[in-house]
Curated annotation (Swiss-Prot):
GO biological process, one term: response to redox state
Any matching Pfam family: Put_DNA-bind_N
Primary site of residence: cytoplasm
Its biological purpose: Modulates transcription in response to changes in cellular NADH/NAD(+) redox state.
UniProt name for this protein: Redox-sensing transcriptional repressor Rex
Organism this protein belongs to: Bacillus licheniformis (strain ATCC 14580 / DSM 13 / JCM 2505 / CCUG 7422 / NBRC 12200 / NCIMB 9375 / NCTC 10341 / NRRL NRS-1264 / Gibson 46)
SMART domains linked: CoA_binding
């Protein structure tokens, strides 16, 4: 089925990998069908939202039957391009960056950190988790084609913008930013900010000032 993915709400698009992960677990356990209520309980998204999310893709289930796990898994694998690997570069091989390199999204068939960059001479020229670490000063020498469209930033905040400018000039299309810096990028660049300190502060605030019923 052909569809215009730009018409899918961004909130829905962000939930698709969550659904896909749960469906993989269901398939591995031998389950053949699942209801929206079961999905809701597993992924902690209300069933009405799940049905609305799925409705953007047409008739994925049947009333009274639920959803065929194999069909859904196949559908979302294709929708999320799980059979096509996207190479990623990582900038900053500190504690967080090193953890990413060792993990390297081994449970995600479609994403892989292909190379990393740092300024630490003790790390340059080594491999971490099987990923080569290059000199950040030679970024432009190593990223010479369009095969790596995504970058992960785990660098000090003060260096983030200048590195981002270089990545944009090299044709990077998306950045996952783990620095506190709010980066300026052209409109055609997709950037997701993940500030762990802010998320933690937000969690503590909600625990103190909101009841569980208000979440």
């Amino acid at each position: 089925m052909n569809m215009d993915h730009s018409k899918i709400p961004q909130a829905t698009a962000k939930r698709l990998p969550l659904y896909y992960r749960f469906l993989k677990n269901l398939h591995a356990s031998g389950k053949q069908r699942v209801s929206s209520a079961e999905l809701s309980d597993a992924v902690k998204v209300d069933s009405a939202t799940i049905r609305r999310d799925f409705s953007y893709f047409g008739a994925l289930g049947k009333k009274g039957y639920g959803y065929n796990v194999n069909y859904l898994l196949s559908f979302f694998r294709k929708t999320l391009d799980q059979d096509e690997t996207t190479n990623v570069t990582l900038i900053g091989v500190g504690n967080l960056g090193t953890a990413f390199l060792h993990y390297n999204f081994i449970k995600n068939n479609n994403t892989k950190i292909a190379m990393a960059f740092d300024i630490n001479e003790e790390k340059i020229g080594t491999e971490v988790g099987g990923v080569p670490v290059y000199d950040l000063n030679k970024l432009e020498e190593h990223m010479t084609d369009d095969d790596i469209p995504v970058a992960i930033l785990t660098v000090p905040a003060q260096a983030a913008q200048s590195i981002t400018d270089r990545l944009v000039a090299l044709g990077i299309k998306g950045i996952l930013n783990f620095t506190p810096a709010r980066l300026n990028v052209p409109e055609h660049i997709r950037i997701h900010h993940i500030d762990l300190a802010v998320e933690l502060q937000s969690l503590v605030y909600f625990l103190k000032h909101y009841s569980m019923q208000e979440k």
